[in-house]
From Swiss-Prot:
GO MF term list: proton-transporting ATPase activity, rotational mechanism
Gene3D superfamilies: 1.10.287.3240
Function in brief: Subunit of the V1 complex of vacuolar(H+)-ATPase (V-ATPase), a multisubunit enzyme composed of a peripheral complex (V1) that hydrolyzes ATP and a membrane integral complex (V0) that translocates protons. V-ATPase is responsible for acidifying and maintaining the pH of intracellular compartments and in some cell types, is targeted to the plasma membrane, where it is responsible for acidifying the extracellular environment. May play a role in cilium biogenesis through regulation of the transport and the localization of proteins to the cilium.
Superkingdom per UniProt: Eukaryota
Family per record: Belongs to the V-ATPase D subunit family.
Transmembrane segments: none
Keywords per UniProt: Cell projection, Cilium biogenesis/degradation, Cytoplasm, Cytoplasmic vesicle, Cytoskeleton, Hydrogen ion transport, Ion transport, Membrane, Transport
Organism ancestry: Eukaryota, Metazoa, Chordata, Craniata, Vertebrata
Protein's name in the database: V-type proton ATPase subunit D
Gene Ontology cellular component annotations, sorted alphabetically: centrosome; cilium; clathrin-coated vesicle membrane; vacuolar proton-transporting V-type ATPase, V1 domain
Record's subcellular location: Membrane; Cytoplasmic vesicle, Clathrin-coated vesicle membrane; Cytoplasm, Cytoskeleton, Microtubule organizing center, Centrosome; Cell projection, Cilium
Membrane topology: Peripheral membrane protein
Main location: membrane
Length: 247
């Protein structure tokens, strides 16, 4: 096992405890990121479905608005000059809010009307009904465009967040966790090898002590048999206490 396949660490009981804690932390992080990815994917699919529905509705609304414009021009004449002259400031404005999905911030756009209708009196002479219908259709078109912009922005943001989250999950699952597991296996192998070496060393020491003891006892027996070693005298057996008489 090369050094690149595992973390460079001195094998010890403390290192084993640290690696076990790191492995547990990596597994917990992987599980949390998977849950985050699932939540983002669920919201991503919901937004994708909503985008498809909004685009289909947008096509119908824009087609209806185009027909209304042609009808209004046919009835009321060319009113583009009047519309341009009455423009002072935007009546339809956009504000942005934020939505949070599993820690990912999504922008949400909303449209609102500000001020009075500058074209309220347009079409009093003729074509008033057609102009009112035209305004309603294009107001609906603006509403759908803002909603579609919000959905598509959220779509792109979620797509990038899901890719990043999945890359992190894959990195933890296929790189970090296996590397920690290989390091942990290396530490356990080294510690087991040390224990075997220590057991073998102690066993050899005991065997050597036993051999030396047996050799010493054998030499002592041989010296005793040759009379070189005298048996120690029993001092207690030779001593005789005098009788004490008390008058």
């Amino acid at each position: 096992m090369s050094g690149k396949d595992r973390i460079e660490i001195f094998p010890s009981r403390m290192a084993q405890t640290i690696m076990k804690a790191r492995l547990k932390g990596a597994q917990t992080g992987r599980n949390l990121l998977k849950k985050k990815s699932d939540a983002l994917t669920l919201r991503f699919r919901q937004i994708l479905k909503k985008i498809i529905e909004t685009k289909m509705l947008m096509g119908e609304v824009m087609r209806e608005a185009a027909f209304s414009l042609a009808e209004a021009k046919f009835t009321a004449g060319d009113f583009s000059t009047t519309a341009i002259q009455n423009v002072n400031k935007a009546q339809v404005k956009i504000r942005a809010k934020k939505d949070n999905v599993a820690g990912v911030t999504l922008p949400v756009f909303e449209h609102y009307h500000e001020g009075t209708d500058s074209y309220e009196l347009t079409g009093l002479a003729r074509g008033g009904e057609q102009l009112a219908k035209l305004k309603r259709n294009y107001a609906k078109a603006v509403e759908l465009l803002v909603e579609l912009a919000s959905l598509q922005t959220s779509f792109v943001t979620l797509d990038e967040a899901i890719k990043i989250t999945n890359r992190r999950v894959n990195a933890i699952e296929h790189v970090i966790i296996p590397r920690i597991e290989r390091t942990l296996a290396y530490i356990i192998t080294e510690l087991d090898e040390r224990e075997r070496e220590e057991f073998y060393r102690l066993k050899k020491i005991q065997e050597k002590k036993k051999i030396l003891k047996e050799k010493s006892e054998k030499d002592l027996e041989q010296r005793r048999a040759a009379g070189e070693v005298m048996e120690p005298a029993n001092l207690l057996a030779e001593e005789k206490d005098e009788d004490l008489l008390f008058e």
